[in-house]
UniProtKB/Swiss-Prot annotation:
Residues given in the record as 3-phosphoshikimate binding sites: 26-27, 31, 172, 174, 320, 347
Lineage: Bacteria, Pseudomonadati, Pseudomonadota, Gammaproteobacteria, Methylococcales
Protein's recorded name: 3-phosphoshikimate 1-carboxyvinyltransferase
Family the UniProt entry places it in: Belongs to the EPSP synthase family.
Naturally occurring in which organism (per UniProt): Methylococcus capsulatus (strain ATCC 33009 / NCIMB 11132 / Bath)
Enzymatic reactions: 3-phosphoshikimate + phosphoenolpyruvate = 5-O-(1-carboxyvinyl)-3-phosphoshikimate + phosphate
C-alpha cells in the first residue's frame, strides 16, 4: 500500500491532440507470465505492462522457482517449468493491489502439491473471494479465507481436484479463468458457463500455447492431461488505458487523438460501443490480428455527446471503463442511465459511490443506485475529489478537468502505478495540463 498522498492537479480546460501508443494490456500481461511459467520451453513476451499489478504476478512466479529475464522495455523471457514444475514459495505471496493475480492464482495453485498463502494490500484483502473459493472447493480444493470470505487465502497442497460443470451466477472473467486454470490439474473435464460474455484472453492464450480449449456459445471446457508449449506473445496496447484518452478527446472541443496498436478483443470493446451510441466520433483503422488477439489503431475526434440508457449487454464488456464513461456522461446532453453493474461496488473501491460523490462535488447531478447510476449532463466546476486509492477513478477525474473552468485536485493517486505508470507523461503529451505533488 502507498502511504504518501499523491495528488494530481489537472486542468483547467484544453484539448487533446497527438499520436501515441498506450502501455500493454494488463489482462494479457498477467496471463502471459502465468501460462509462460507453466509451459515447456522459453516464452518470449514483448509489450509487457511494467506496472505494479503485473510485476506482482511476476514476483509470485519467481518466488515459486521460475526464472524470468526482464522486464526490459516491455520484453520478458520466461523459462517455463511445465505444469508440475513450480516449487513451494518460502513465504506468503503478496499480490499488492491485484485482484486478477489473486483470483487466477487461487485456481492455478489449488492443484499444486504444496501449500501457499495469498495476500495483498488493504484494498485487495477487502475484495470478495468466495466467488472463486466456493467453486474451487466444489472441485475438491481446500482453501481457508477470513470469516468474511476475503484474503488471506490459505491453499492446501495435495488436493485431488475433480472437473466441474459450473454455471457462473455473475459474469466474471476472473472466475472463469480461475476455474479453467484449476481445470489444468483436475481429473476429467472442467466446463464453465457464463451468463454473459466476458473477456476471453485466457481461452485465446491457452490455445496459443497449444492447449486445446472447447468453446460452444457461452460455455467453455478444458480437459486435463495436456501440456503448454512455449510461444511468443506480443501484448497489444490496453483498451482500458486507451479509454481515458478516447474519452478525453470525445469531450473536449478541437481534440483529435490517434491511439496505436490497441487490443480490440470483442469481449473488451463495450467502451467503443457505448461511446458511439452517445454520438462519439471513433474510427477503427487497420484492424489486424496479432498472436490470436484482434488489434487496431483508433482515431477519436471531438463531437457533442448525448445521454443514453446504457445497454446491459455491454456492462461486462466495459466493466473497467465505467469510471471514465461516467465522465463522458457528465459532459453529454441529457440523462445517462446505467443498470446491471452492481459488480462496480466491489472493485478496488466502490466505484459507483466514489464516482457519484466526486461528480457531485464537481457540480454534476449524479444519483447512485444499487446497480448503477443516473447522471444528468451539466457543467463541471473545479474542486477537490478523493480517488479512494482507486487508479481508474484518479485517471477519470484527471480527464474531467478538460471541461472544468478551474483545476480539479485529485487525492490518493499513487495506485495509478498499478495499471498505467506513465499516465501523467502521456496525458501531458496529448495536451492535458496535469501536475503531481
Amino acid at each position: 500500500m502507498h502511504d504518501k498522498d499523491v495528488v494530481f492537479t489537472a486542468g483547467p480546460g484544453g484539448r487533446m491532440q497527438g499520436d501515441i501508443r498506450v502501455p500493454g494490456d494488463k489482462s494479457i500481461s498477467h496471463r502471459s507470465v502465468m501460462l509462460g511459467s507453466l509451459a515447456e520451453g522459453v516464452t518470449e513476451v514483448s509489450g509487457f505492462l511494467q506496472a505494479e499489478d503485473c510485476l506482482a504476478t511476476m514476483a509470485a512466479f519467481r518466488a515459486m522457482g521460475v526464472e524470468i529475464e526482464g522486464p526490459t522495455e516491455g520484453r520478458l523471457r520466461i523459462h517455463g517449468v511445465g505444469l508440475h514444475g513450480l516449487k513451494p514459495p518460502a513465504a506468503p505471496l503478496d499480490l499488492g493491489n491485484s485482484g486478477t493475480s489473486m483470483r487466477l492464482l487461487s485456481g492455478l495453485l489449488a492443484g499444486q502439491a504444496f501449500d501457499t498463502t495469498l495476500t495483498g494490500d488493504a484494498s485487495l484483502v477487502r475484495r470478495p473471494m468466495r466467488r472463486v473459493t466456493e467453486p474451487l472447493r466444489a472441485m475438491g480444493a481446500r482453501i481457508d479465507t477470513t470469516e468474511a470470505g476475503t484474503a488471506p487465502l490459505r491453499i492446501a497442497g495435495g488436493s485431488r481436484l475433480k472437473g466441474i460443470d459450473y454455471a457462473m451466477p455473475v459474469a466474471s472473467a476472473q472466475v472463469k479463468s480461475c476455474l479453467l486454470l484449476a481445470g489444468l490439474y483436475a481429473e476429467g473435464k472442467t466446463c464453465v458457463t457464463e451468463p454473459a460474455p466476458t473477456r476471453d484472453h485466457t481461452e485465446r492464450m491457452l490455445a496459443g500455447f497449444g492447449y486445446p480449449v472447447a468453446r460452444d456459445g457461452n460455455r467453455v471446457c478444458i480437459q486435463s492431461g495436456g501440456k503448454l508449449s512455449a510461444t511468443r506473445i506480443d501484448v497489444p496496447a490496453d483498451i482500458s488505458s486507451a479509454a481515458f484518452f478516447m474519452i478525453g478527446a470525445a469531450i473536449s472541443p478541437g481534440s483529435d487523438v490517434f491511439l496505436r496498436h490497441v487490443g480490440i478483443n470483442p469481449t473488451r470493446t463495450g467502451v467503443i460501443e457505448i461511446l458511439r451510441e452517445m454520438g462519439a466520433d471513433i474510427e477503427i483503422l487497420a484492424p489486424r490480428e496479432v498472436g490470436g488477439e484482434p488489434v487496431a489503431d483508433l482515431r477519436i475526434r471531438y463531437r457533442e455527446l448525448r445521454g443514453i440508457r446504457i445497454p446491459e449487454h455491454t456492462v461486462p464488456l466495459a466493466i473497467d471503463e465505467f469510471p471514465a464513461l461516467f465522465i463522458a456522461a457528465a459532459c453529454a446532453t441529457g440523462e445517462t442511465v446505467l443498470t446491471g453493474a452492481e459488480e462496480l461496488r466491489v472493485k478496488e473501491s466502490d466505484r459507483i459511490q466514489a464516482m457519484a460523490d466526486g461528480l457531485t462535488t464537481l457540480g454534476i447531478d449524479a444519483r447512485p443506485t444499487p446497480d448503477g447510476m443516473v447522471i444528468r449532463g451539466g457543467s463541471f466546476r473545479g474542486g477537490a475529489v478523493d480517488s479512494r486509492g482507486d487508479h481508474r477513478i484518479a485517471m477519470s477525474f484527471s480527464i474531467a478537468a478538460l471541461r472544468a473552468p478551474i483545476p480539479i485536485e485529485i487525492h490518493d493517486c499513487a495506485n495509478v502505478a498499478t495499471s498505467f505508470p506513465n499516465f501523467v507523461e502521456l496525458a501531458r503529451t496529448l495536451g492535458l495540463d496535469i501536475e503531481v505533488s
